[in-house]
Each structure stands twice: as structure tokens, then as C-alpha cells.
Amino acid sequence: MSRLIFEHQRRLTPPTTRKGTITIEPPPQLPRVVPPSLLRRVLPFLIVILIVGMIVALFATGMRLISPTMLFFPFVLLLAATALYRGGDNKMRTEEVDAERADYLRYLSVVRDNVRAHAAEQRAALEWSHPEPEVLATIPGTRRQWERDPRDRDFLVLRAGRHDVPLDAALKVKDTADEIDLEPVAHSALRGLLDVQRTVRDAPTGLDVAKLARITVIGEADEARAAIRAWIAQAVTWHDPTMLGVALAAPDLESGDWSWLKWLPHVDVPNEADGVGPARYLTTSTAELRERLAPALADRPLFPAESGAALKHLLVVLDDPDADPDDIARKPGLTGVTVIHRTTELPNREQYPDPERPILRVADGRIERWQVGGWQPCVDVADAMSAAEAAHIARRLSRWDSNPGYIRSTSTGSATFTTLLGIPDASALDVASLWAPRPRDEELRVPIGVTSTGEPLYFDLKDEAEGGMGPHGLMIGMTGSGKSQTLMSILLSLLTTHPADRLIVIYADFKGEAGADIFRHFPQVVAVISNMAEKRSLADRFADTLRGEVARREQILKEAGRRVQGSAFNSVAEYESAIAAGHDLPPMPTLFVVADEFTLMLAEHPEYADLFDYVARKGRSFRIHLLFASQTLDVGRIKDIDKNTSYRIGLKVASPSISRQIIGVEDAYHIESGREHKGEGFLVPAPGAVPIKFRSTYVDGIYDPPRAEKSIVVHALPQPQVFTAGRVEPEPDTVIATGDVEVHTAPPRKLIATIGDQLAAYGPKAPQLWLPPLDEPIALADVLAGADVEPGQLRWPLGEIDKPFEMRRDVLVYDAHTAAANVLIHGGPRSGKSTALQAFVLSAAALHSPRAITFYCLDYGGGKLADLADLAHVGSVATPLEPERIRRTFGELEQLLRARQRQGAVNRTGSYTDGYGEVFLVIDNLYAFSRDNTDTFNTRNPLLAKVTELANSGLAYGIHVVITTPNWLEVPLAMRDGLGLRLELKLHDSHDSIVRVAGALRRPADSVPADQPGRGLTMAAEHFLFAEPALSDIAVINARYPGVSAPPVRLLPTDLSPDALAPLYPAPETVVIGQREEDLAPVAVDFANHPLLMVFGDSKSGKTTLLRHIIRTVRENSTPDQVAFTVIDRRLHLVDEPLFPDNEYTANIDRVLPAMLGLSALIEKRRPPAGLSAQELSRWTYTGHTHYLIVDDVDQIPDTPAVSGPFVGQRPWTNIVGLLAEAADLGLRVIVTARATGSAHAVMTAPLLRRLNDLQATTLMLSGNPTDSGKIRGHRFARFPAGRGLLLTDTDTPDHIQLVNPLGDAALSGNIGNNGNHNRGGEYR
């Protein structure tokens, strides 16, 4: 059966209706009656009594005193009484109330006429859109046939009859006081008007089947079928077969009730035929209909679902009470499918009504709907259509078919993106034709939608001077207005028709919506920047990019103009004229910048208002065009931005005032809300121009390419066939062959993606004006490979510096030759400080040998530097648990510094000859380091001063300092100037930042992301990112230098033999007692100048061993005439140590006092005699040997007076204490030992120890309990290995030393002392 193509035309304009709100003034209020007070009620009566009294008095006196004044006075009082009685009454008079009531009733009559006018307009519009069923037969073949599109309000709204419908205009009464105070007659009149006029009586009403998944119809079969026929007749008359399909399953399909459906093109099955033509969705069973509908229902989402592109809606009629409506799709409902099921089963009384699946009852010409309370009237007068009338309409429609080239869209009706641009198939673009050169007048001029008259709306981005609307524009639209849809339409039209050498785009969305990300792969798109609200660095980067592009274009115009014409070009137009004249210049494409949600950007970054103003002013000449888009317009924030815009686009806005600000009138506010009105707006092409109403094309939907036409060939002679509603089988000798049809197996793709992929594969990409931010980690290997740094130059890369203004990234390079060779890295917790040090060390090691660079590390930052301990370039890694290694590290570096200062360690070849090369002291976490090794008197680590010295003095001698700290304030002031290279990572508090930008409202530190370790700022406020090191590279680097490593840090031995320090007696009375930790030099005690020595330590700390070493060394290097010993050894530890003959050794306490008295008497004799002259005194010297008083464990000897014997009342140390101050001159040497525990108290109470401490005797503090609160000369004891201690001289500068162990050889030989005690293993005692 052949059909004619129905040519669609633009829909006739229906009668207009006025919407909005009709505000009604409230009725007048009755006056409130306030009861008078008692005084006001009584006062008139008192005045009357007074008047009567006066008159009586006048007559009682014979009226002799009557005068005109006296006669007038009673009348005045009478008038006053009357005024009080009447004037005090605040009641409104009846006449006034009547007058106000009459005025209000006249006002209501005017309102009633206005409301009736609204109702009449609404009725006319409804009658136009939903005429009587009898009128439908006149529609086929006219312009109104199939007039409804998805964008129309009445799309898929099917008339069901007549009913009272609400008035479109809302009636609102202004706020009033309590209704009790209203004038009753006026109030009743108002209530009557509202009750009557709020509805339009007996108006056409319909069912919006787009919002219904199922309609259950109950009633007599004939009556229900008549109603359903009326609904279907409405549907097929107004809706194109491409937008609406009809399907039926009825046992009596061939009866007159439904056989007429066979004539409708809406029931055709696509690409399928039977013996008489197209197959039909008409079956006798639900199962058969389900099978036939399966392809059409396969990919539909569940009901309800939002869809950008309208699906073909299906009306599925089941005229079978026994059928299951859910059996059609075996699901509760599908989008775009409405099942109309006629049944006889009444709903259960407890059944809850479903608004998406209504149950209707057709009876007595009415339609009722099942609600919670039972059946409620739905349609007062139901439409009904006989089978004959329906067949008549179907036959009239049967001759027509829809135009396959007429594509309908929810946005623009028949005008789509592809039709407006003349693209037959967006999946097979002719890019060469689309990007072909065009005249300047046609450039940047593209259709983006249609106007209210159906004409294409052209968006011309060119400058006004070139005939366009630009260069800059403003678009405002609230949420749901279609702002993103309009922006996408503009972008896609421009990008589809312009190559990258004519147009490039930057899309910036501050709010973070990802809708524009689909444009990211277009070749003309420089960048799609989203989520700037959460990543402030993106906003700063965007600003730098705009400033940089303005500067770049200005520089290009200057250089090209001077080369071509001797002076700079004033604009890109002159630049392009030079290209047209034959000069070889690169193209300069127009830059189109879309700033979406720019008001939110200005709220967070107010300084960007000046940026946009600057770019808008300068960009006009440089072809940088800006389109500002937002949901609202904050005049206070945007400053002069709106003054720099020429064209305006106003979509649906939130208030009339915003509409007036954008387009000059309130029309943008009155745009209707709803999905069907998205993308509607007004374009003002120039200031003061008349707004043009338009609707933008919808480009964000799935694109379905046009399919090849399917031909049906019948190879048989024509034979008459009976045309039935059901399937007609072909004749036996008839063969139906179908042509090959292309099957699209690819997944659905959006139109934008379909076009973007083709453009990306064809054309060159835009210049790289935007580099992605430093969000992704950078491997150190990649940085080393990409950096232009030669090995061995004492320069190595650390990461990358981001320079969006120059539109490039530079390598962050450390240069040891510059003044910035000392490095400070400061950042908050987990900011990547330790990883940065790893990158620093590994990068240097990758380019230098261990002889050229060495590292010595102090790991206070959590252990990451310890991972570098195996690197050949690392001499040592010390942790806070290794204080000795830390001290030795500084000792080695100080010794190296002194050596290089003495000999200027750089030879003629420019390298160091001491084997260390360039030395780096690396301290991770200076804050923790500075608070280590502290006490009450030393709140900072004493070693911090050595770091400061190295930072300030070591640079000239190849010694560098690299430190990290959580806070710049933790760096000592004296050290700061020596730290030339300062890198700042993310800080806990941006107020601690030392990076400043002049004139900036915000600190640059605020823009550093918190979740990206290694990201930071240079002192020039440039963002950088440290490279990510790989510890697996350590083995690779070590393999390059087999057998070569950095000099290790030498530690003090735990068992020091005398041979290691020979000679032990380098000068008279100078005894080498051990080795100093700082420089590993021998430590000697010069008893001639420092005759007093105190040794404190706990058991087995080395006290007695030191005494043994001193005795042995002095005895072996002296004669009995030179030296004598007095040894007091309470515990017999020194009994086996031989002395000179006649020397005193005692372990008996009773012998201590006589020995001390004899020694003191001997020493006293060495004083010069009285009567010597000054010259004799200057030449006076004592004669005799030097006497060494050695007391082991002096704290064990009681200092109490003797209670018996010849020395009653005398103390052992009294006479010796008086000689200590002159011990050096009198040849007395005093060496005492004592326990560390309690020693602080002992030096304050014991006479001998107190005097020695007062004289600043040389003090050796061996191992002791650190929890002991006592201190010796400001120093607390610590746990040391045996023989290790702290030596305090008269300068109070402590030296950590290791004592000589003279017992080592004896222990190895197994000697046994004279007292029978075995020296176990050569232990210190």
C-alpha cells in the first residue's frame, strides 16, 4: 500500500494565554471598638450636674450677678459635655461602612471581569488544542495534522472529555488580619469569587500519557472501548508516526471495534512486511504482541527515566480482561510506553492509588478515578467515539506517511544541529568541506538554534567592527534553564566549522560540572578546566594563562610588525593582512574563552575582576574573546565586566530585576520552567538592540545515524488481497526479499563525541597554551632523562617548575656552584619533605661519582633517609637513637672544614683531593633536631650552632647544608642568610609562608594542594613538583662505581688499647687518658697545670681502670725520686698495681686520717719560709718529688671526726682541702673517683668534692643514671658504654672521650691479680 509524504510546516500559533498571579486586595476591615474608661463615661454627667447647679445658684441669688459672660458659661459647659459624649466614640458610622463596602464590591466586579477574560483565553486555547472528537475528521490533510512536537506543552496529552479545570492564573489575596475583623458582606463576596473563578467550568481535559506507565479502564465493554477509541483518535491525529506508535492485542481483532486501526501508519512495524504491505502491531494475543514489540522495547530504560532525546512513544492497548499488562515487557514499566488495559476487575478496597498507573472507571458518560477514599470524579463528560467515526479518521490518515528527512527534536522541533549546519550524517563528516576557507564575513558565524518564527539564529563571535556581535558576551541562566545546553551548542557549532588555525577554545568551569569534558579531545580545544572551586591552583593557573596569552600575542604583533613594516601591528587584523599579502607569518587563531560560573569565581577570587577587565580590554585587538556565563548576576562583584560585553544572552532567570539587567526587559524571567523549555532564551546582539527569542539546539544527546532504506521486493504477479488488521500471509508463489541493511553494533555515542573523534583524526591540534597542572607524580628517571644536564657538573634536576604565564614547564635544577647551594625545604606534615631529600640525593648520585659528591644524613623525619644508607655516595645516616654517630658526623665535617680552610682544598683541576668531594650535610626535620639533646639550661641542641657555622662558612669550601623543617620560624636567624635555595611545600598554616607576591590579596601558599606531597612554591611563587625517587635505583647506581664509596664516619672504639694512642706520656706530667670523639685525637691531662681530677661513674664504668692507667703510665715514665703515690683503695681494686717503694697504699679506713695528716705536713713544708724578699720568692721552688694522691671511691670513705686515738676530733680531708688551691705550686696531684648516683649532692656537701668542684677541677663524667636529677657543672649523666664519658675542663666545654683500657692485654693473657681477683675479659671497672 503506497502513501504520500506529509510535508510538515511550522505549527500554527495557538491562542495565547496569560499566566502568572492575579493579586486581589483584601476586604475592608471593621473598626475596632475600644471601651471608654470610667472617667470618660462619668464626666458628661458631672458636667450636666454642674450646669444645673449653676442655674439654680443664679436663680437662688436673685439673678443680681447675671452678666453676659455668666449666661454664656452654662452653654459652653453643655457643648463640652456633648463633645465628650459623642466625640469620644471611635465607631465608624454606618454610612462610611456602606461606602467602603460598595467600593470594594465594585472593585471585585472589575477583578471578576479580568479573571473571566483569563478563563476565556484559557478555554479558547484548550478548545484549540483539544477540540471535540467530531472535529478530528476535518484535521487530516490540513496544516494542523501531526502538528505536535516534543517541545509543545500538549505533546502526548490526549483529550478525555470535559471537566472543571484549574485556572492557569493563580488568584492570591494579599495578607490580611484575622478574618473576624473583615467586613462580612465584602468577605462573603470575595469568597464567592474565589470559589467560582478559580476553575474553568466544563473545559477540555486530557491525560498526559508521557507521565503514565499504565491506564486501567473499567466499565462496560462498549462504553470503555468508545472512550479508548476517542483517546487513540486524538493521539494519531496530532502526533507523527515517528513520534507515536499504536499497538493492540484483542481477541476480536477483526471486529469493527478495532479493525479500523489497520489503516493507521502509526501501527506499522518498521522494516517488516506481510502479504499486503507493512506489518502491523495488531495481534489477537498478548504473547504475540510481546514478541512483535520486543525489538522496539529492547533498549528502553525503566519507567520513569530522563532522556535528552525523545523516544518514540508507544500506546499499547490490551482489550482483554484476562491479559496481564505487565506481560508486555515483563517489567513494571518502560520509558515511552503506556499500556491501556481494559478489564472488569474492580480494585481492592485497600489498594493504594498509583499516580503513574491510574485506574479509571467509565460509566454513564463520566470517568472516575480510583483514589484513597474510593472513586472520585475525573471527567464530567467523557469523550466517546464510535467505530465508524474512528474508521473515517483512520482512512483519512492512511494516505499519509511521515517525512523521513524531517527530524524532530525536543529543543527546536524540526531544526536540529545537523539540519542547521546542513550535515546529512554526523557520523561521516566531510571535514574538509566544513573547514574550507571562508570569507571573513562568514567566519565565526554559526547557527545555534531557531528563533520564535522558526528561522535559524546565528551567533556571530566577530568584533562589532567586523560585523559581528563580539568580542565579549554575557550569558545568565538559572539552574535548569539550559545554560550548559546553550554553551554546548555554541561550542559545537564553532568547533565543527573552524579548524585550529582559525579558532581555539578554553573552557573554564569554576563550579566543577563535568559536562564540558566531552570537548576535551577536540583539536581546537586548548583546555577544559573544571573543579576550580576545590582546586585553587587551577584558578591561579587559569589567570596566569590568560595574562600570558595576552603578553604572548602582544609580543608576536610587535616582533612581526617590526619585521614586516618597521613598527608593531596594532591588531590581529593587520597581522592577517600581512599574511594575505604574502608574508610568511604563522597563523594567529581567535581565542574563545568561556568562563562558566564566573560570579562564583569572583566570590572566591575578587581580584579576578581586574583580570577579566584587563583581558577584555586588551583582547579586543588580540582576538581574545570572552563569554561570561553564570546563574545570576552580582553587580557588586563583577565591577566593570558587564560594561565590556557587547552581546547578552538571557535564559530563564530568577527575578525580573536580573532579566532587566541582562536584556533590558523582564521577558527572561517569564520564560516557563520545565524540561521542555530548557534552552529557551533571549539574545541581545548589541547594546540597546531588541531581544530575539530563541531556542538552542540540543547537542548532548545520543546520536542515531540515519540508516539505509530497507527495500521490499515482491517477486510475483499482483493479486488482490483482503486487507485485515491481523497479519496477511503472502501467496505461496510470492517471495519477499529484503536488501542488506547496515547493522549498527557499536554502542550508542553522543553527538559531540561522534563529531569530536572525526575532527581530532583530521585536523592539527591547537597550540599548547595550557599545560595540565602538576597533579600527577613525576618519576625521577623521567626528569633525569628530560633534563639537559651533563654528568659531573655539580648540577642535577630535582623536579619541574610550572610556569603557566610562559606556557611551559622548566626543570627545577640544583646548582652547587651558585650562592643558592644551601637548601631549605619547609613544609607541613606529610608534605613530602623526606621524599624530596631522597630525590635530591638520588638525582645527584645518578650524575656524579662518590668521589665527587658525598652525603652525611641526620634522619629525624621518620626513617626515609635510612633507606639511602646503602647508597655508595652516602657516608653515614644517623638517627636520634645514635647520638654518638650524630656527634661524630659533625666532628668529621668540622675537621674537614678546618683542614680545607687551612690548605684551601681545591687544587688546580677544580676538585678536592681529600677524598670527600662536595660534601652535603642533610638534616631531615630541623625542628626535631634542634629539640634533641636539650635540657633546662640548653633549650636548643648545642649542635645547632655547628649547623649554622657550616651553613655560613662551609659553602666556600665545598660543604653544603640541606635541611627540612615544618616551619620557617624554626630556622635560627643566624642560619637563614646562608640558606640560599628555599623551597616551600604545603604548610599546615599558610600564615607561616615566606612566599609573597606584591599586591596579591591572597597568600600564594593557599593555592598549594594539600593532598599532593612534593608540590610547593619557589620564592618567586612558582609552583613546582619534586620528582618521585625510586629506591630500586640504588643498586643500579652502586653498580656503576664498584669498590668506591663515600668516606664513612669514624666512631670511637668501644675498647681502646694503649697502643692505639702511643705515646701515652708525651710530656712530663702529661698523661694521655683516651681519645676525643670530636676529632678522634688523643686526650691528655696535663697534671702540671691541672693537678686536680674528679672522676664520676657508676659501677664498671671505667673509674678504677682510669686510675690504673694513670698510675701505670706515670710510674713507667718516672723515677722514685720524681714521683710518689698515695693510693687509698677501699675496695682493693688497685692492690695489684705496683707503686714505687715507700709509697703509701691503704685499704684501711683507719689509715686514711694518719696518711692525710702526714701528706699534708709534707706538702706544707714546701711553702717558702717567712722573711724572703720578693726576688727570692720569685725564684723559690720546692724540692722533692711530685706527689699523686689517688682516692678510689672517695664517697665510700666517711668524712667524720675520729672518736678515739691520737687524732680525736680530726677529719680525714680537712688538711688536704686547704692545700688544693696551691696544688700545682706545691707538687700535689689529687685524683679522686666517686659514684655517679648522688654525686651532685656530694659535690655540694662533701668537703673534698665540694672544694674540687669550686676550683673547677678537671671532671670526667662516665656512665650514670640519666634520671638522677643532679648535674655536674650543668651537665647531666647519661648511659655510656664502659670507658666512654664526658670530659669537663676549666672551659666547661664538654668533650666525649673513650678511655684507654690498659687491661686488654692482661685479660687476653689470663693474668690474675695479686689479690686473687680475675680481671674478667679486660673489662673497664
UniProtKB/Swiss-Prot annotation:
Name this protein carries in UniProt: ESX-3 secretion system protein EccC3
UniProt keyword Cell wall biogenesis/degradation present: no
Location within or outside the cell: Cell inner membrane
Residue stretches spanning the membrane: 42-62, 65-85
SUPFAM superfamilies (alphabetical): P-loop containing nucleoside triphosphate hydrolases
Record-level Gene Ontology MF annotations: ATP binding; ATP hydrolysis activity; DNA binding
Domain FtsK: 454-660, 808-994, 1080-1268
UniProt topology in membrane: Multi-pass membrane protein
Entry binding sites for ATP: 477-484, 827-834, 1097-1104
Cellular component, GO annotation: plasma membrane
UniProt subunit comment: Part of the ESX-3 / type VII secretion system (T7SS), which is composed of cytosolic and membrane components. The ESX-3 membrane complex is composed of EccB3, EccC3, EccD3 and EccE3.
Originating species: Mycolicibacterium smegmatis (strain ATCC 700084 / mc(2)155)
Functional summary from the UniProt entry: Part of the ESX-3 specialized secretion system, which is required for siderophore-mediated iron acquisition and for the secretion of EsxH and EsxG.
Consequence of gene disruption: Deletion of the gene impairs iron-bound mycobactin utilization and EsxG and EsxH export.
PANTHER family in alphabetical order: SPORULATION PROTEIN RELATED, TYPE VII SECRETION SYSTEM PROTEIN ESSC
Keyword tags: ATP-binding, Cell inner membrane, Cell membrane, Membrane, Nucleotide-binding, Repeat, Transmembrane, Transmembrane helix, Transport
Lineage top rank: taxon: Bacteria
